[in-house]
Amino acid sequence: MLTLPAPAKLNLMLHIVGRRADGYHELQTLFQFLDHGDELSFSPREDGEIRLHTELPGVDHDSNLIVRAARLLQHESGCPQGADIHLLKRLPMGGGIGGGSSDAATALLGLNHLWQLHLEEDQLAELGLTLGADVPVFVRGRAAFAEGVGERLQPVELPEPWFLVIAPQVSVSTAEIFADPELTRNTPAITVRSLLAGGGHNDCQPIVEKRYPEVRNALSLLNKFVPASMTGTGACVFGSFPNEGEADKVRRQLPDTLPSFVARGRNVSMLHRCLEKLAQEVSA
């Protein structure tokens, strides 16, 4: 059995710099991975079937991104094998930290390894893009500055602090936020250099705070300890700390009713670290 992580990511900032003729928004965002996430385990099947096993209630099997990713890879590669896929879900649904997209990317990379397809990263990222705009981010597995609708990625080296992530018990509708007439859509474009020097904010945050008091309250609570931000369109919010101890000290002061976790920022995703280790073991 092959077991691999599906790590979370944080959007450390999100600027909306314009709107295209097709209705999509032009974005600038900076993201980094976390050493915390879901976990997928893969076993080959000889009958060609894809079977997802999870304890999550209400998950439609055929429309799940993991199953769609696996079937897409089967179809595009002509692979006759199937797989049993076991999902251990740790990340909140609809939290803006990439749970579904990360799961899909781990399915693509994991099955590429399990089935010995030897597809290149570029090919897998291209397949991932047909599943969702964020999937290539996880396929690439490098902290990056993203532009366009998120498809133009420029790898960056960032500090790797510890983060406290709070998951308000609400699922934010991304479509609803991007359709809000009060959303800022003309933030001046920023260069990577300016951004790394300390610029950047989240244009979606004021809209989400207005519509979702749960997110507003979580930000207010975390702001008592460190500057707090929202990732993507929410609902998760985060603050950074110089070490695990300080982050955990604040986490222990949060209400038990507010789910949270502490994780370290990573410029190379834990998925890629695992795959590199596997490749080294094979070649040894």
Curated annotation (Swiss-Prot):
Documented EC number(s): 2.7.1.148
Disulfide bond annotation, renumbered to this chain: none
GO process annotations (BP): isopentenyl diphosphate biosynthetic process, methylerythritol 4-phosphate pathway; terpenoid biosynthetic process
EC category name: transferase
Molecular function terms from GO: 4-(cytidine 5'-diphospho)-2-C-methyl-D-erythritol kinase activity; ATP binding
Binding residue positions for ATP: P92, M93, G94, G95, G96, I97, G98, G99, G100, S101, S102
Active-site residues, as the UniProt record annotates them: K9, D134
Reaction(s) this enzyme catalyzes, per UniProt: 4-CDP-2-C-methyl-D-erythritol + ATP = 4-CDP-2-C-methyl-D-erythritol 2-phosphate + ADP + H(+)
Pfam families the UniProt entry points to: GHMP_kinases_C (PF08544), GHMP_kinases_N (PF00288)
Functional pathway: Isoprenoid biosynthesis; isopentenyl diphosphate biosynthesis via DXP pathway; isopentenyl diphosphate from 1-deoxy-D-xylulose 5-phosphate: step 3/6
Keyword set, alphabetical order: ATP-binding, Isoprene biosynthesis, Kinase, Nucleotide-binding, Transferase
Function text: Catalyzes the phosphorylation of the position 2 hydroxy group of 4-diphosphocytidyl-2C-methyl-D-erythritol.
PANTHER family the UniProt entry points to: 4-DIPHOSPHOCYTIDYL-2-C-METHYL-D-ERYTHRITOL KINASE, CHLOROPLASTIC (PTHR43527:SF2)
Family per similarity comment: Belongs to the GHMP kinase family. IspE subfamily.
Protein name: 4-diphosphocytidyl-2-C-methyl-D-erythritol kinase
Lineage summary: Bacteria, Pseudomonadati, Pseudomonadota, Gammaproteobacteria, Pseudomonadales
